[in-house]
Amino acid sequence: VLPPAGSIPIQQQQVRERSLVPLEPLFSLEPQQLLQRSDSVELQFDWPRSADDPRELSEIPELRLWSLRADALCPWLPLLLERSSGQLTRHVAMLLPHSFSRSEGIRFAPDSLELWMTHRLFLLDHWSRGHGLNCRGNLEQMAAVLGFELDGSFWNGLS
């Protein structure tokens, strides 16, 4: 069972071992149940840092490696991550090259974002449709949050 409010604590040892045990409650959910959790899951990394460590979480190699593994084995995870607090953006920052500025926030390398986002759109659309579900609206919202402009004809010709 997931903790209340969709918060998933990820302990330091689990990160070091690249253990996905914290995500296991999601593995048993049917696709429809997963989609019902869209925009509601928060990953809470318990990763101690000294007060003078200026790095963002996405700059910590161990957290990036854990996130890469989670993304590879749970390709639907970005759909579930909460968007308004930056959970989705932080997760994608763990996966893709990016820069950060105080005025603009995270800016993804455009080619990397386009490749990852297009791949993820195809993958999750196929996955959801294979289960008789449609999550295109949700995928479009996810893309918009990441600053990826989806052409209106993107879905044309895809069954």
Language model features by range: what are they?
Residues S40-S50:
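Generic short beta-strand segments
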Residues R64-A70:
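Short, structured motif recognition centered on aromatic/hydrophobic residues
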Residues V1-D39, D53-E59, C74-L158:
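Glycine-centered motif in EGF-like
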Residues V41-L43, W66, L79:
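One face of beta-strands
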Residues W47, A70, S85:
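Residues that form ligand- and interface-recognition hot spots within folded domains
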